[in-house]
Amino acid sequence: MTLARFVLALVLGALPEVVGFDSVLNDSLHHRHRHSPPPGPQYPYYLPTHQRPPRTRPPPPLPRFSRPPRALLAQRPHALQAGHTPRRHPWGCPPGEPWVSVTDFGAPCLRWAEVPPFLERSPPASWAQLRGQRHNFCRSPDGPGRPWCFYGDARGKVDWGYCDCRHGSVRLRGGKNEFEGTVEVYASGVWGTVCSSHWDDSDASVICHQLQLGGKGIAKQTPFSGLGLIPIYWSNVRCRGDEENILLCEKDIWQXGVCPQKMAAAVTCSFSHGPAFPIIRLVGGNSVHEGRVELYHAGQWGTVCDDQWDDADAEVICRQLGLSGIAKAWHQAYFGEGSGPVMLDEVRCTGNELSIEQCPKSSWGEHNCGHKEDAGVSCTPLTDGVIRLAGGKGSHEGRLEVYYRGQWGTVCDDGWTELNTYVACRQLGFKYGKQASANHFEESTGPIWLDDVSCSGKETRFLQCSRRQWGRHDCSHREDVSIACYPGSEGHRLSLGFPVRLMDGENKKEGRVEVFINGQWGTICDDGWTDKDAAVICRQLGYKGPARARTMAYFGEGKGPIHVDNVKCTGNERSLADCIKQDIGRHNCRHSEDAGVICDYFGKKASGNSNKESLSSVCGLRLLHRRQKRIIGGKNSLRGGWPWQVSLRLKSSHGDGRLLCGATLLSSCWVLTAAHCFKRYGNSTRNYAVRVGDYHTLVPEEFEEEIGVQQIVIHREYRPDSSDYDIALVRLQGPEEQCARFSSHVLPACLPFWRERPQKTASNCYITGWGDTGRAYSRTLQQAAIPLLPKRFCEERYKGRFTGRMLCAGNLHEHKRVDSCQGDSGGPLMCERPGESWAVYGVTSWGYGCGVKDSPGVYTKVSAFVPWIKSVTKL
């Protein structure tokens, strides 16, 4: 080793282990030993001319071989067979398959498929897996040991050399913590840097993923070291962002010169799901897909206790790390004991959560464990030969399917035996099993992958059994193998579940069903949606009470893709995935058909009646008002959020029971609406009914009630050819104060004071109704915040039509048009009073169009009619 190289190694901390200083000097990072090729046609093999390196390149030196591949022992030069064995040194290869594609002296590896004559003459069967492979990564096909590869010298000869797996390793230096710093790359025995030219977040993300510091990287730049001793290896790195290793990215070898701004590439790593989720890593495993679970919290890494640790917890960990496939929990420090604090205990995930933070668990730092109980997981990727059971009531039974080339397919039952069933169930983590009738499960529509399978019973994997080639069969799907497995003590099965959430409900137990598939939340179409489907959704979410299905976008329309259609659950399945019979993304629906559920549904209904004394204490109360939704420019309301909203409907003899007007409940027996609602069909009580407690017009609900009309009172000054005095009262059928039953979803609104000026006393005003949303009439109750305007706006716009018995309201901004429309006539304009009670200040009356610029809505001013209302209703 030269003095300059020794100083450089000392600065970088890369000085080789000193077995003897003389041996270090004689055995430098680049070996110089050469041997002559043996005679004969078999070795060396000459490359075609177009594959040869240019002759101007000096022949690369061979390494000293500490232990060459067994298959090449007979083909090595005699001098090498009888020669000395040089000092052995670690080569930095982790378990698994490295991404290195150069020898430890810098010669680029040939693709394995580029030397077929040599491989065909090589007898070991273990080499067959490399025949035809287009990659050039170093491998050890003849057994455990140091990986190697073939390379071509300048004369076109094929030779081989060992690889140093540390080549391409990365580290971060100079940052404030382990998640940030200048990127350093290991190559040719020395750590070096990367020029920051074209360095972006995709490149940074690959670095973070390679270091297991999260999937999200932010590209940074740092000045080069002033010493100038650190080499620059690459520039213009061009990663896609999904590479496993920086070696797999396109890049330019540094040819000296000036790096732009003299800046080196640097990164800041973070977890891709955002700061709300704890950072997780897997430590001590044989690959990035397994290890002891460690969480980063309060500035340090710690472990998780394995109390109640199961595959559902592992499913969440794997999902949070972005690792799909088989999730399995490991106990009792299977991947070694940690050394930091024990962060969490008693983790009890359902398997649906996106982060361990969302699972029930102990408080941070609370536990009764030692590191002998450290929890671990393995997240085995989906690979050819993975099996599952589909179409059954759970993951323990169903049609046997095998994963091959990115697609699930079935197995033909020709020659099927109990031993085959035993091996399949054992691979799925069950102890026992039996063949089931194919008639119990729906036929598959995918490929038939396997036929004539024959197992001895000793196999640990299904693909170890003898069988035909993939896709070769003489069967139909009527011959698909179906089995039922019985649980064993170790559950190791493929989890087919995906996260489910409920959106836009009154509480977390109800809402529009959304599922997380292919990295995106989407909805379920309500074709065939029943209470049995709802039961499975609620069970998957951890609810044990009765479940009810809701259809026709009962909880509002979703915005993402429609993932699933024609769900067919029996009600006993473990998760929604067990009910899906149709390809993901295939449907014939719109978001107006989004499915919903209500979990722990008990249908409790209040039956209390109102009286004059209690009316003042319950009027204007909104018991459910924590969320807001469309009149023109509006949003879906919260179910039960406007309990005084009622609808005036035509009886079926005069139509289909359709909505005619909105209205406001003033007491158990009296309703306020607009006089013009009765212009077309007259004021005969036989023509009308009033519906209270409604939310979705097409879905019957537990608080919903339709009541007949006993009396219609139109203000005596109202004229059909005018819009003034547009107010009416409706008396419901029933005994005094016992017409509509009050509940959390059915309550009266308060009246304003006589001559009260709401522009001065009221704030936070809303209009509600089922009217025109700008696209169609809404099925769900809509709401929209609306400002009260000075009367001059309406006087200027409507001239003499606007009187002192009217209110002017609406948003005049071009991008915030809010207005009531057809179908909302007679509905309330509500404003919140001090003290959190709500009063009806306006009755939707008229206007020029819907949401038209500079044309605010006009509402009957209720405060001008309070004496008349009280004289009629006796309130």
UniProtKB/Swiss-Prot annotation:
Record keywords: Disulfide bond, Glycoprotein, Hydrolase, Kringle, Protease, Repeat, Secreted, Serine protease, Signal
Cross-referenced SMART domains: KR, SR, Tryp_SPc
Domain named Peptidase S1: residues: 631-874
Main location: secreted
Gene Ontology biological-process entries: exocytosis; proteolysis
Localization per record: Secreted
UniProt-listed InterPro entries: Kringle, Kringle-like, Kringle_CS, Kringle_sf, Peptidase_S1_PA, Peptidase_S1_PA_chymotrypsin, Peptidase_S1A, SRCR
Glycan-linked positions: 26, 683
Zymogen activation region: region residues: 619-630
SUPFAM superfamilies: Kringle-like, SRCR-like, Trypsin-like serine proteases
Residues spanning the signal sequence: 1-20
GO cellular component assignments: axon; extracellular region; plasma membrane
Keyword check for Repeat: yes
Domain SRCR residue range list: 170-271, 280-381, 387-487, 500-601
Family, similarity comment: Belongs to the peptidase S1 family.
Listed PANTHER family: EGG PEPTIDE SPERACT RECEPTOR, SCAVENGER RECEPTOR DOMAIN-CONTAINING
Role: Plays a role in neuronal plasticity and the proteolytic action may subserve structural reorganizations associated with learning and memory operations.
Name used for this protein in its record: Neurotrypsin
The organism of origin for this protein: Trachypithecus phayrei
Gene name, Swiss-Prot/TrEMBL: PRSS12
